[in-house]
UniProtKB/Swiss-Prot annotation:
GO terms for cellular component: cytoplasm. It comes from the Bacteria. Keywords: Cytoplasm, Elongation factor, GTP-binding, Nucleotide-binding, Protein biosynthesis. Gene3D superfamilies: 3.30.230.10, 3.30.70.240, Elongation Factor G (Translational Gtpase), domain 3, P-loop containing nucleotide triphosphate hydrolases, Translation factors. The lineage of its organism: Bacteria, Pseudomonadati, Pseudomonadota, Alphaproteobacteria, Rickettsiales. The gene is fusA. InterPro entries: EF-G-like_DII, EFG_II, EFG_III, EFG_III/V, EFG_IV, EFG_V, EFG_V-like, G_TR_CS. Catalyzes the GTP-dependent ribosomal translocation step during translation elongation. During this step, the ribosome changes from the pre-translocational (PRE) to the post-translocational (POST) state as the newly formed A-site-bound peptidyl-tRNA and P-site-bound deacylated tRNA move to the P and E sites, respectively. Catalyzes the coordinated movement of the two tRNA molecules, the mRNA and conformational changes in the ribosome. GTP binds at residues 15-22, 79-83, 133-136. This is Elongation factor G. Pfam families: EF-G_D2, EFG_C, EFG_III, EFG_IV, GTP_EFTU. PANTHER family: RIBOSOME-RELEASING FACTOR 2, MITOCHONDRIAL (PTHR43261:SF1), TRANSLATION ELONGATION FACTOR G-RELATED (PTHR43261). HAMAP family: EF_G_EF_2_B. One of its GO terms (biological process) is ribosome disassembly. It is found in: Cytoplasm.
Length: 698
C-alpha cells in the first residue's frame, strides 16, 4: 500500500440528522465504483448504515470508515452520526480527519445540529466545504441556505456553483470556476453528464457570482491580485490553487449544490474533495507528547518517521470480532510486527489488517502514514483514544477529551443466564464507546449504566437485546449523591471479643477531619477523595496491623451515615492504639476501624453532597432571557455570557438533579435552535430542604 501522501484524502461527511448525509456517501461509493447497487436509506438498504437499529431508524449511529478511489486519489470517508446524543462519535471522527464535507438540507438550511457539528469542527480546525443537498425538493432555496451559513455559523461561504432550475426542474449546476453548465442525464442514474453553455437566463447571475469568487480568492496572493486588478484573465489553474489554499487555511468554505437522491452533483463534489480538501501533507504535523522527555511537541506526518497511530474507534464485527480503527500518522506498519500502546504501556502484536468498505472488508499487509485501517485481534487493553507507537520512539498523540456521562439508569437482568451475558455485553459496549460507562451499586447490587442522553442509553439497551440477546428490566434515571463531614472529631474505640478459644482485641484512636481543613496537603493527595495516614510511634500498633485499619475504613466509607451514600473528602489519621500478643490480628483492627467510623462520623456534622454540572447553553439572542430564567428556576448559578458567532453562550453551574428532561425544555424554549452541553464539575452541599426529601426517599 505504499503510495504518495498527497494522493490521500481523509474526509468526514457531517450534517444535521436527515440532511441526506448517508445518501450522499452512498452516491460517492456508487460513482467511485465500490457499490454495484445504490442503497436507499428509506428502504433500509444503505451500505454505510449497517447496524440493524440504523437500518430501522434510518439514522446513522456508528461512523463506518470506507475507502474509495477517484481520479487516482484514495479517499477515506468517515460517515458520522448527526443526532445530538452521538456527538461523541462526531468528535472522535473529526479528530482523525483532515477535511470534511458539511451537508445541508436545501429546504431547512442550517439546523441546530449543523451548528453543533460546525462548532466541533472549529474546535479541531478541520478545513471543510459545504454541499447544499436536496435541491430537487419543494421549497429548496440555495441562496437562503448560503445566507444562513453566513449568519448562523458566522462562516465565510465561497459559492463555486449555482443551481440550474429549482425543485422538480433542478437539472444541473453552473460551475463558476470553469464558467460552464454541468447537466445530468436522468436516464443514466446520474452517471452521465455533460458540460454545456451557461443558460441565457443565468448568465448575469453567473457573472455576478464569478466576480465575487474572484474578489475573495485573489486576496490570498499578491501577484495574482495585481494581475486581476490590471484586468488580466486569471486562469482556471490559478483559481483552483487559490481555492485550495483558502479552504485549507479556513479563509472561506467552498459551497456546492446538488441532489444526492436524484444523482445530481455528486461527481463535481468528488472533484472538489480532491482539488480543495487537504491531504495529510497539508496538515503537516500532529501534536503529541514524547514519552521519554514528557515534552509536548509537533510530530511530522511522514512515512519516513517512526510509526505512530491513534485508535479512534472500536467496533464489534459479527464476522471478525473486535475491530480497532486506527489512523496512522507517521511511519508504517506491517502485520506481524509488535508495537506499544503508550497510554497503557502494553505491547500489542498486529495481526490482520483490514481496509473497510462500509460492510465489506479487504485484507492488507501494510499501512502507512495517512491510512485509516481496522486491526483485528488486538487485546482488550487498547481503547478509544490510545496511541500505538514504535517501541524505540514512544509518543502519546493528543488525547481525545470525552465528556462525562450525564444520565444513569439501573438495569437488572431477567434471569441468571441473562446476568452472565449482560456482563460481557456491557464490557464490550463500553470498550467501543468511551462516553458510555457501567458500574455496580454496592448497596443494591444493581448494575448502573451511564451515558450522554436518553437516546444514547436506549440504543445501548437495544443493542444489548439484539446483539447479545440479553433481556433486562430498566429503571428510572438517578443522581449519584455523596456524603462528607464538615468538622474534625476524634474517636477512641476498643474492639474486644472473648468467646472460648482465641479472642479478638484491637484498640484504635483516630482523628477524622474534612480535607479542606488539612494543612500541608501533599501534591499527590490533592485529587484524592479519602486519605489515610498513620502517626503511630513506639509500636502502639504493630506495623503489620496498620493496613487492616486502612482497609476497614476504605470499605466502610462506601456506606455513609446520612443516607448510605459513599463518604468523600475526608482524612483519617491513626494516632494511637493498643494490641494483645495473642488476640490481635489484621482482621481485629479492620473491625475496630469500621466501628470507629460508625461512631465518629455522626460527630463530624455530616452533610449530603450532590453533583454540580458545568452547563453551557448556546442560544440565539432572542431566547436568552427565557433560557436564563429557566436555569435560575433549576437552582442554577449563571456564571457569565459571551458571544459566539451570532449566538450567546451562557455558562452556569446547575445541580444534576435539576437537569433531567432539560433537553426537551430547551427545545421548546428555543424552537429547537439552542443546544447545550454539560460536564461534571464538583460536588456541593445539598440545601437542607432538598436533603430532607432525599433522606425521606432512602
Amino acid at each position: 500500500m505504499s503510495k504518495k501522501l498527497e494522493n490521500i484524502r481523509n474526509i468526514g461527511i457531517c450534517a444535521h440528522i436527515d440532511a441526506g448525509k448517508t445518501t450522499t456517501t452512498e452516491r460517492i461509493l456508487y460513482y467511485t465504483g465500490k457499490s454495484h447497487k445504490i442503497g436507499e436509506v428509506h428502504e433500509g438498504g444503505a451500505t454505510m448504515d449497517w447496524m440493524e437499529q440504523e437500518q430501522e431508524r434510518g439514522i446513522t449511529i456508528t461512523s463506518a470508515a470506507t475507502t474509495c478511489r477517484w481520479q487516482d486519489k484514495q479517499i477515506n470517508i468517515i460517515d458520522t452520526p448527526g443526532h445530538v446524543d452521538f456527538t461523541i462519535e462526531v468528535e472522535r471522527s473529526l479528530r482523525v480527519l483532515d477535511g470534511a464535507v458539511a451537508v445541508f438540507d436545501g429546504v431547512a438550511g442550517v439546523e441546530p445540529q449543523s451548528e453543533t457539528v460546525w462548532r466541533q469542527a472549529d474546535k479541531y480546525n478541520v478545513p471543510r466545504m459545504c454541499f447544499v443537498n436536496k435541491m430537487d425538493r419543494m421549497g429548496a432555496d440555495f441562496y437562503r441556505c448560503v445566507d444562513m451559513i453566513k449568519d448562523r455559523l458566522g462562516a465565510k461561504p465561497l459559492v463555486i456553483q449555482l443551481p440550474i432550475g429549482i425543485e422538480e426542474n433542478f437539472k444541473g449546476v453552473v460551475d463558476l470556476v470553469k464558467m460552464q453548465a454541468v447537466v445530468w442525464k436522468d436516464e443514466s442514474l446520474g452517471a452521465e453528464y455533460s458540460y454545456q453553455e451557461i443558460p441565457d437566463d443565468m448568465k448575469a447571475k453567473a457573472e455576478e457570482y464569478r466576480a465575487n469568487l474572484l474578489d475573495m480568492v485573489v486576496e490570498l496572493d499578491d501577484k495574482i491580485m495585481e494581475k486581476y486588478l490590471s484586468g488580466e484573465e486569471v486562469t482556471e489553474e490559478e483559481i483552483k490553487k487559490l481555492i485550495r489554499k483558502g479552504t485549507i487555511s479556513a479563509a472561506f468554505y467552498p459551497v456546492l449544490c446538488g441532489s444526492a437522491f436524484k444523482n445530481k452533483g455528486v461527481q463535481p463534489l468528488l472533484d472538489a474533495v480532491v482539488d480543495y480538501l487537504p491531504s495529510p501533507i497539508d496538515i503537516a504535523t500532529v501534536k503529541g507528547v514524547e514519552v521519554s522527555t514528557g515534552e509536548e511537541k509537533d510530530f511530522p506526518i511522514s512515512v519516513s518517521e517512526p510509526f505512530s497511530a491513534l485508535a479512534f474507534k472500536i467496533m464489534n464485527d459479527p464476522f471478525v470480532g473486535s475491530l480497532t480503527f486506527i489512523r496512522v500518522y507517521s511511519g508504517k506498519i506491517t502485520s506481524g510486527t509488535t508495537v506499544i500502546n503508550t497510554v497503557k504501556n502494553k505491547r500489542e502484536k498486529i495481526g490482520r489488517m483490514l481496509l473497510m468498505h462500509a460492510n465489506n472488508r479487504e485484507d492488507v499487509k501494510e499501512a502507512s502514514a495517512g491510512d485509516i485501517v481496522a486491526l483485528a485481534g488486538l487485546k482488550d487493553t487498547t481503547t478509544t483514544g490510545d496511541t500505538l507507537s514504535d517501541e524505540d520512539k514512544k509518543v502519546i498523540l493528543e488525547r481525545m477529551e470525552f465528556p462525562e456521562p450525564v444520565i444513569e439508569l439501573a438495569v437488572e437482568p431477567k434471569s441468571k443466564v441473562d446476568q452472565e451475558k449482560m456482563g460481557l455485553a456491557l464490557s464490550r459496549l463500553a470498550a467501543e464507546d468511551p462516553s458510555f460507562r457501567t458500574s455496580t451499586d454496592q448497596e443494591t447490587g444493581q448494575t448502573v449504566i451511564k451515558g450522554m442522553g436518553e437516546l444514547h442509553l436506549e440504543i445501548i439497551i437495544d443493542r444489548m437485546r439484539r446483539e447479545f440477546k440479553v433481556e433486562a428490566n430498566i429503571g428510572a434515571p438517578q443522581v449519584a449523591y455523596r456524603e462528607t463531614i464538615t468538622k474534625a472529631c476524634e474517636i477512641d474505640y476498643t474492639h474486644k471479643k472473648q468467646s472460648g478459644g482465641a479472642g479478638q482485641f484491637a484498640r484504635v484512636k483516630i482523628i477524622f477531619e474534612p480535607l479542606k481543613d488539612v494543612k500541608d496537603l501533599k501534591e499527590e493527595d490533592k485529587n484524592k477523595s479519602f486519605i489515610f495516614e498513620s502517626k503511630i510511634v513506639g509500636g502502639a500498633v504493630p506495623k503489620e496491623y496498620i493496613p487492616g485499619v486502612e482497609k476497614g475504613l476504605n470499605n466502610i466509607r462506601e456506606t455513609g451515615v446520612i443516607a448510605g451514600y459513599p463518604m468523600i473528602d475526608f482524612k483519617a489519621t491513626l494516632i494511637d492504639g493498643a494490641f494483645h500478643d495473642v488476640d490481635s490480628s489484621v482482621l481485629a483492627f479492620e473491625i475496630a476501624a469500621k466501628a470507629a467510623f460508625r461512631e465518629g462520623m455522626p460527630k463530624g456534622n455530616p452533610k449530603l453532597l450532590e453533583p454540580i454540572m458545568k452547563v453551557e447553553v448556546i442560544t440565539p439572542d432572542e431566547y436568552m432571557g427565557d433560557v436564563i430564567g429557566d436555569l435560575n428556576s433549576r437552582r442554577g448559578q449563571v456564571q457569565g455570557m459571551e458571544p459566539r458567532g451570532n449566538a450567546q453562550v451562557i455558562k452556569a453551574y446547575v445541580p444534576l438533579a435539576e437537569m433531567f428532561g432539560y433537553v426537551n425544555t430547551l427545545r421548546s424554549l428555543s424552537q429547537g435552535r439552542a443546544q447545550y452541553s454539560m460536564v461534571f464539575n464538583h460536588y456541593d452541599q445539598v440545601p437542607t430542604q432538598v436533603a430532607d426529601t432525599i433522606k425521606a426517599k432512602k
